[in-house]
Amino acid sequence: MSESVHTNTSLWSKGMKAVIVAQFLSAFGDNALLFATLALLKAQFYPEWSQPILQMVFVGAYILFAPFVGQVADSFAKGRVMMFANGLKLLGAASICFGINPFLGYTLVGVGAAAYSPAKYGILGELTTGSKLVKANGLMEASTIAAILLGSVAGGVLADWHVLVALAACALAYGGAVVANIYIPKLAAARPGQSWNLINMTRSFLNACTSLWRNGETRFSLVGTSLFWGAGVTLRFLLVLWVPVALGITDNATPTYLNAMVAIGIVVGAGAAAKLVTLETVSRCMPAGILIGVVVLIFSLQHELLPAYALLMLIGVLGGFFVVPLNALLQERGKKSVGAGNAIAVQNLGENSAMLLMLGIYSLAVMVGIPVVPIGIGFGTLFALAITALWIWQRRH
């Protein structure tokens, strides 16, 4: 089936519904699998510092394949690329279920995720246009965060019951995403007929990086989203160690409940951003970014569950308001310069490089014995300072 690009720009067209459902199921699997695999590592007595290593092999796949996945997304119908990528995720989750080394299985899921991301965001610009793109991003983020909310909780709760059941549920979610991808209209490839010479692809990707970096707006977006997602992933792992130390709770479910509060907040923040921020007023999101770091610092000092829930929800609201406009800005400007697929691939490189760096520093801090509360305080302080510096730089340029 095919249809011309931009024929139906409704936020609830058939194609958009299929994208949102597929994204929900795929993201549900991603987040449930993380906590199910963390429970598996705990059950098999892996050291605590190995937990962030699990995410590092995942983002390492993003970085390794960054020069190629953008071109893949732009050279084929994006819905079919998403289906293939979810198939890889399904294979990775199934391999962990059948006893293959969890780091190897999770790496395969990372490869699928790397291929999936440019297609899932790039297709938004093909299904809707102009002012509706921010709203479409809001829908995508809301779907993603709802999946984070339910997937994280499901992964932790099912893992407390039986780790294998949790892992099987992840594989089932990926299978559902593959089916949903079938219903995405087969849109024309954005940039067909490109060279598949790996050297040329790498050179083309580096040219896309250079082009986006030289543009002040896209550079601003790249740095902002990279800082946010690097910090967000690190916070998830910090919670796993913070909960038993600060709250005295040792189950698998409580960290997932706390992560779910962040997810709920991001849904609210994403909705607010869609209503209050346009591509011309993106700088309105910057104070929210600074406050994220401040609230993380305050959160790290808590010892009661209810204040922890409230502060994490606030972090989520601020995060959703901060990141959605930056995503939309990059997609709109990137689509016109290097193609949406390449723009998102460059964004993934930045975000996952930031994740790798922050997780590496966090893992090292845990390995050398720094207590988790001082880690959280330092983490929040540095994030607030980094976003402040970015805002000052953006206003000057």
Swiss-Prot record:
Which family is this protein grouped under? Belongs to the major facilitator superfamily. LplT (TC 2.A.1.42) family.
Q: How does it sit in the membrane?
A: Multi-pass membrane protein
- What is the originating organism of this protein? Escherichia coli O9:H4 (strain HS)
Q: Please give one Gene Ontology molecular function term for this protein.
A: lysophospholipid:sodium symporter activity
According to UniProt, the name of this protein is Lysophospholipid transporter LplT
Keyword Phosphoprotein set for record = no
The cellular location(s) given in this protein's UniProt record come to:
Cell inner membrane
One annotated Gene Ontology cellular component of this protein: plasma membrane
Q: Which residues lie on this side of the membrane: Cytoplasmic?
A: 39-52, 112-144, 188-226, 278-280, 326-343, 388-397
Q: Which InterPro entries match?
A: LysoPLipid__transptr_LplT, MFS, MFS_trans_sf
Entry function: Catalyzes the facilitated diffusion of 2-acyl-glycero-3-phosphoethanolamine (2-acyl-GPE) into the cell.
UniProt keywords (A-Z) are: Cell inner membrane, Cell membrane, Lipid transport, Membrane, Transmembrane, Transmembrane helix, Transport
Periplasmic topology: which positions?
A: 1-17, 74-90, 166, 248-256, 302-304, 365-366
The primary location reported for this protein is membrane
| Signal in keyword set | no
HAMAP family assigned: MFS_LplT
Q: Which residue spans traverse the membrane?
A: 18-38, 53-73, 91-111, 145-165, 167-187, 227-247, 257-277, 281-301, 305-325, 344-364, 367-387
